[in-house]
UniProtKB/Swiss-Prot annotation:
Similarity field: Belongs to the Cdh family.
Protein name: CDP-diacylglycerol pyrophosphatase
Record-linked InterPro entries: CDP-diacylglyc_Pase, CDP-diacylglyc_Pase_proteobac, HIT-like_sf
Pfam families membership: CDH (PF02611)
Any GO molecular function: CDP-diacylglycerol diphosphatase activity
Enzyme superclass (EC): hydrolase
GO cellular component, one term: plasma membrane
The entry's keywords: Cell inner membrane, Cell membrane, Hydrolase, Lipid biosynthesis, Lipid metabolism, Membrane, Phospholipid biosynthesis, Phospholipid metabolism, Transmembrane, Transmembrane helix
Gene: cdh
Length: 251
């Protein structure tokens, strides 16, 4: 009986993985890279016009792009080839701190909205290798889900300065959480914090998704989840975001 149960579980996992694979590759996984390298960057360099991006910073190595999903969602992407969280380049000291740059770009949301958006309503997220649809590194700059905001507010005093399991999980998935100051976030990439501080993470970075959220006391919470097909977790940190920005209508 036990063998039958394990077999059925294995079949379910294989089918789930196959479904994820189809979902991921049924479109063009290089679409964002083509926009950055073939449109935004050449237009900026040749015509000083970032279109179709909102901003292009060749020397700093990044662009900001308005995503088509959601009225206020933007993406921060590198101006050169980095696939995603699995890239060794993210652990190089010379690589830009893309999460900090993404946080600095949150003003585009307010500009698009027409009003100031409080930092507490903003979140940053990057999905794992299996949890993404595009093979060009992109950090989602968007609103946080109201229920996630409430949970993190309630857990404020229980989140440590070390990576520890977040009490109660998030969205039904296990997350690690770590509190950092604004200065720490500005000086050190969350990718490096995860790789250097979580056992075995460095060798399996592509399995992880990361998110960053501002807390009411001015600190930031780093969130990390590792893919686990047995629990149907593709490690898509974007799940904590709400691209419709319902949190703004409740304020």
């Amino acid at each position: 009986m036990k063998k039958t149960g394990y077999f059925l579980l294995a079949v379910i996992v294989i089918v789930a993985a196959a479904g994820v694979g189809y979902w991921k590759f049924s479109g063009n996984p290089d679409a964002l890279r083509e926009i950055v390298l073939e449109q935004c960057l050449p237009d900026q360099l040749q015509h000083q016009n970032p279109a179709p991006c909102a901003e292009v910073k060749p020397r700093a190595g990044y662009v900001v792009f308005k995503d088509r999903h959601g009225p206020l969602q933007y993406l921060l992407m590198p101006t050169y080839r980095i696939n995603g969280t699995e890239s060794p380049l993210l652990l190089e000291p010379a690589t830009p701190n893309f999460f900090w740059l993404a946080w600095q770009a949150r003003g585009y949301m307010s500009k698009k909205y027409g009003h100031d958006i409080p930092d507490s309503a903003v979140s940053l997220a990057i999905n794992s290798r299996l949890g993404r649809s595009q093979d060009h590194l992109h950090i989602h700059i968007s609103c946080i889900r109201p229920d996630v905001r409430e949970q993190l507010d309630n857990d404020l005093t229980r989140i440590s300065t070390r990576w520890l399991p977040l009490p109660g999980d998030l969205m039904g998935h296990e997350y690690l959480a770590r509190r950092v100051t604004e200065s720490e976030l500005a000086q050190r990439s969350p990718f490096m914090m995860l790789a250097e501080e979580v056992p075995e993470a460095r060798d399996h970075m592509g399995r992880y998704a990361l998110a960053v959220v501002r807390q009411s006391d001015g600190s930031f919470v780093l969130l990390a989840t590792e893919r686990n097909l047995l629990t149907f977790n593709r490690a898509s940190a974007e799940e904590i975001q709400d691209h419709s920005c319902a949190i703004l209508s409740s304020r």
